[in-house]
Amino acid sequence: MAYERLGETPLDYMPCRYGASKLLFRGPRQNLTGRYAAFLGGTETYGKFISRPYPALIAARTGAKCINFGWPNAGIDVFLNDADLLAAANGAQVVVLQLPPAQNMSNRFYRVHPRRNDRFLEGSTMLRSIYPEVDMTEFHFTRHLLGHLRKVSPSRFELIRDELQTAWRARMRLLMERIGVPVILLWFSAHAPRHEADSPDLSEDPSFVTADMVEDARPMALQVVDVTVSAAALDAGTTGMMFTEFEAASAAELLGPASHEEAADALAPVISELVCG
């Protein structure tokens, strides 16, 4: 693993902006002209601690222009709320959409930050009535909140989980309706899609998304690409990642360069066909 002195940032993500978007995406900035593939997703697509995340690997392999619109901890809301991002996506030949987790979006039980979707803003009256013993002001992140609620009462938590999954289905339909070009849905995870998903743990990402939910979204997509990372790639861990000693624990929770190679292997052929002809 690569370390730099504490307090320094070993990777320059070359943050850039497209149009009037308030989001700073990973650079270098590219022109939204000609034929290109747009990659929408979360921390993995952004490539935190990764010098060449899978969109960059695909670009190098195929010669296609691949524009990285990954945003750390993105839920569906951040994409729906950004008109400039949607316009950029609609200018592409194809959009690769990394399937997002279900907890990072506003719903009937709580509200999240419109751009930093992992930030919990406030719980609804309904949530407070279900969990009257929980002080919602103690929580700032959705994952922390949901982990605590599940621990307090697994039975009551089923109501929360069901709401997240229902909202995810509806919001995914809306997002894909607003993308007017072919969409490839990407399952990029350390585990295969499961029939049950009720844990907010990072290792379970995309959290609360089940195999049935993926199948519900399939008819709206050009195809679904399943990149369930191999045991060998998981065993490689943080090898090749770049982070400070202070960031080591965070880096260890993310998929490493070997996993990104597998994602590029799966996506490169279809990107080459659709973008390069």
Regions found by a protein language model. Name each.
Residues 1, 37-41, 98:
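Short, hydrophobic/glycine-enriched beta-strand segments
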Residues 1-4, 55-60, 142-149:
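A broad, low-specificity signal for short, low-complexity segments enriched in glycine/proline
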Residues 1-13:
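Helix-enriched interaction subdomains in cytosolic or periplasmic regions
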Residues 6, 16, 21, 28, ...:
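Generic signature of intrinsically disordered, low-complexity segments enriched in small/polar residues
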Residues 10-72, 78-90:
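Serine-esterase "nucleophile elbow" of acetyl-processing enzymes
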Residues 76-77, 194:
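Short secondary-structure boundary/hinge segments and terminal tails
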Residues 87-277:
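Alpha-helical cap/lid subdomain in secreted, periplasmic
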